[in-house]
From Swiss-Prot:
Major location category of this protein: mitochondrion
UniProt entry keywords in alphabetical sequence: Electron transport, Membrane, Mitochondrion, Mitochondrion inner membrane, NAD, Respiratory chain, Translocase, Transmembrane, Transmembrane helix, Transport, Ubiquinone
GO CC, one annotated term: mitochondrial inner membrane
UniProt-recorded name of the protein: NADH-ubiquinone oxidoreductase chain 1
Catalytic EC class: translocase
Record flagged with keyword NAD: yes
Subcellular localization, as worded in the UniProt entry: Mitochondrion inner membrane
Membrane topology: Multi-pass membrane protein
PANTHER family on file: NADH DEHYDROGENASE SUBUNIT 1 (PTHR11432), NADH-UBIQUINONE OXIDOREDUCTASE CHAIN 1 (PTHR11432:SF3)
Underlying gene: ND1
GO biological process terms, semicolon-separated: aerobic respiration
Length: 313
């Protein structure tokens, strides 16, 4: 029993370290890709091809001074970025392992973590006691809650298809045909919902530079800003992993799975470099009038398929 617990903790710690390192290289990839989209080089001065750039940025961030907003709620102001990063790392528990001691059979757990992360945005904006931060946090809360509904329905429809909450089953059921082949509209809506869930372009209303300066994290610098930054980018990697697992075969023990994960992460960056920001009413219309009916139709269709299949048997 103690051995199983020790192995679980050790494997989870290794996974978290790998996620944090991959966040550093995702930021480097984003800056390189955006550089080539802007017809420039991107970071290439620090070390070989600019590879140590994210680590030097991290050192620079942590060496900065931490200002304390005079009218802020001190404890909540400092605690919310920590809680945000903790949730975005705990969410990786559902990453499927082939070993028994690390298998986590509850796939809907990630929805609990994403729902709780809404509170961190809200508390961060409110405790900063800044109008810009409060407006950014309110936008983020409305946006995240709206798109979580379609995310939950998409995941539920595919879980009904495989008949289990265990993410391991997605690999077994996609041996001969990927789910993206017969549910391509569902995959597109899942990707769009992931963009909105992680506050990325074209849904970056929580961080609209022209309106809210930096959004809910405007009063944070050094450590607090770094933790929010790490949480956002680890969520991007997690959503890319989930997309690859659910729609692109889910063969997570092979090299191709991580290649597909990197490709989906590249699409996150590519969308940022090419698409303009949506209007806020169009964002809500897209969630409630496009994604929600689509995911509900697929849900009823897959339920009907399951009932018909089991009645034939």
């Amino acid at each position: 029993m103690m051995y199983d617990l020790f192995m679980f903790v050790l494997n989870f710690l290794l996974l978290i370290i790998c996620v944090l390192i991959s966040v550093a290289f995702l930021t480097l990839m984003e800056r390189k890709v955006l550089g080539y989209i802007h017809i420039r080089k991107g970071p290439n001065k620090v070390g070989f091809l600019g590879i140590p750039q994210p680590f030097s940025d991290a050192i620079k961030l942590f060496c900065k001074e931490q200002p304390i907003p005079f009218m802020s709620n001190y404890f909540l102001y400092y605690f919310s970025p920590v809680f945000n990063l903790m949730l975005s790392l705990l969410i990786w528990v559902i990453f499927p392992y082939l070993t028994y001691m690390c298998s986590f059979p509850y796939g809907f757990y990630f929805l609990c973590c994403t729902s709780l992360s809404v509170y961190t945005f809200m508390i961060a904006g409110w405790s900063s006691n800044s109008n810009y931060a409060l407006l950014g946090s309110l936008r983020s809360v409305a946006q995240t809650i709206s798109y979580e509904v379609s995310l939950a329905l998409i995941l539920l429809s595919l879980i009904i298809l495989i008949g289990s909450f265990n993410m391991l089953y997605f690999m077994n059921f996609q041996l001969y045909c990927w789910f993206i082949v017969f549910s391509f509209p569902l995959a597109l809506s899942f990707f769009g919902s992931s963009l909105a869930e992680t506050n990325r372009t074209p849904f970056d209303f929580a961080e609209g530079e022209s309106e809210l300066v930096s959004g809910f994290n405007i009063e944070y610098s050094t450590g607090g800003f770094t933790l929010i930054f790490l949480a956002e980018y680890s969520s991007i990697i997690f959503m890319s992993m989930l997309f690859s697992l659910i729609f692109l075969g889910g063969d997570f023990y092979s090299f191709y799975f991580f290649f597909k994960l990197s490709l989906v992460s590249f699409f996150f960056v590519w969308v940022r470099g090419t698409l303009p920001r949506f209007r806020y009413d169009k964002l809500m219309y897209l969630a409630w009038k496009s994604y929600l009916p689509l995911s509900l139709n697929f849900l009823f269709f897959f339920i009907g398929l399951s009932v018909m299949f089991f009645s034939i048997i």
